[in-house]
From Swiss-Prot:
It is found in: Endoplasmic reticulum membrane. It is an enzyme of class 5 (isomerase). Keywords: Endoplasmic reticulum, Glycoprotein, Isomerase, Lipid biosynthesis, Lipid metabolism, Membrane, Steroid biosynthesis, Steroid metabolism, Sterol biosynthesis, Sterol metabolism, Transmembrane, Transmembrane helix. The gene is erg2. It comes from Aspergillus fumigatus (strain ATCC MYA-4609 / CBS 101355 / FGSC A1100 / Af293) (Neosartorya fumigata). Its main location: endoplasmic reticulum. In Aspergillus, the biosynthesis pathway of the sterol precursors leading to the prevalent sterol ergosterol differs from yeast. The ring system of lanosterol in S.cerevisiae is firstly demethylised in three enzymatic steps leading to the intermediate zymosterol and secondly a methyl group is added to zymosterol by the sterol 24-C-methyltransferase to form fecosterol. In Aspergillus, lanosterol is firstly transmethylated by the sterol 24-C-methyltransferase leading to the intermediate eburicol and secondly demethylated in three steps to form fecosterol. This is C-8 sterol isomerase erg2.
Length: 239
C-alpha cells in the first residue's frame, strides 16, 4: 500500500506557504492601523488649521489696495510697501526679506515668484510676469487668493461663456479643490496667498520640470528656498 505520510519537502512547502500568508496578513494589519492613525490625525489637524495661520486674507487684500493707491503702476515700490508693512505687523520673524526671484513653471504657465513666506499651512508670494502667461490653476489642498497688483488676470470655468475678470485691486479666490483655466494678460503681478495644506501643492509646482522644461537649476532653487523657509518656520514653531 502507498505510504500515507507526507514527504519532508511537502511539509516544508506548506509551512513556508503558511508563513508567507501570516506575514502578509500582519503587513496588511500594520498598514491598516497606519492609515487609520494618519486619517484620524489629518482630520484632527484639518479641523484646527485656523489656529496655525498668521496671515489674514482681508488684511492682505486691504494692504494690496493701499499699495496700489500709494504707488500706482510702480510694482517695484508696491512690493517694498507690502513687505515693509508685513514685517511690522507679523511677529516672530517669519518673513523672507531676501528678495530672491525664481522662475516658476506650473500647469503650463510660466512666471517668476518671490517667496515672502512658506510654511506647512501657508505661503505668501509675489507672482507674475512682464509678458503674460496662461495655464491650469491646479487642483489644490489649500485656498488660493490672488490679489492683483498690476495688470489683469482672467479666468474660465467650464459651462460659462464669459471670462472672470480681475483688474488691479481685486482678489481672485480659488477655493480649495476647485480648478480653472487662467491667464495673466501682458504684464501682470499679484500678491498670492495660500492657506491650507501646502506640501501637497509642491507636486503641481514640480511636475512641469520633469515633463517639459527639464530646468533642474530652477527646480533646485525652488526647493532650496521653499525648504529653507518651511524648516526655519517649523523651528520657530510656525506650523
Amino acid at each position: 500500500m502507498p505510504s500515507k505520510s507526507s514527504s519532508p519537502q511537502s511539509n516544508s512547502t506548506r509551512k513556508n506557504s503558511c508563513g508567507c500568508c501570516c506575514f502578509s496578513v500582519r503587513k496588511f494589519g500594520f498598514l491598516a492601523v497606519f492609515v487609520a492613525i494618519f486619517a484620524a490625525l489629518y482630520s484632527y489637524l484639518d479641523a484646527r488649521l485656523e489656529q496655525f495661520y498668521i496671515f489674514n486674507p482681508e488684511h492682505l487684500h486691504d494692504l494690496s489696495q493701499r499699495a496700489i493707491q500709494a504707488h500706482g503702476n510702480d510694482t517695484r515700490a508696491m512690493v517694498d510697501f507690502i513687505v515693509a508693512e508685513l514685517d511690522q505687523k507679523i511677529p516672530g520673524n517669519h518673513l523672507n526679506k531676501n528678495e530672491e526671484w525664481i522662475f516658476n513653471n506650473a500647469g503650463g504657465a510660466m512666471g517668476a515668484m518671490y517667496i515672502i513666506h512658506a510654511s506647512i499651512t501657508e505661503y505668501l508670494i509675489i507672482f507674475g510676469t512682464a509678458i503674460g502667461t496662461e495655464g491650469h490653476t491646479g487642483r489644490h489642498t489649500a485656498d488660493d487668493y490672488f490679489n492683483i497688483l498690476q495688470g489683469t488676470q482672467v479666468a474660465f470655468v467650464p459651462g460659462t461663456f464669459e471670462p472672470e475678470v480681475y483688474p488691479p485691486g481685486t482678489v481672485h479666490h480659488l477655493r480649495r479643490g476647485e480648478v480653472k483655466q487662467y491667464k495673466m494678460e501682458q504684464s501682470c503681478f499679484a500678491l498670492e496667498y495660500a492657506r491650507g495644506w501646502i506640501p501637497p501643492m509642491l507636486f503641481f509646482g514640480y511636475a512641469d520640470t520633469f515633463t517639459s522644461t527639464l530646468d533642474f537649476p530652477t527646480l533646485w532653487a525652488t526647493t532650496r528656498v521653499t525648504g529653507r523657509e518651511m524648516i526655519t518656520n517649523l523651528l520657530r514653531r510656525k506650523f
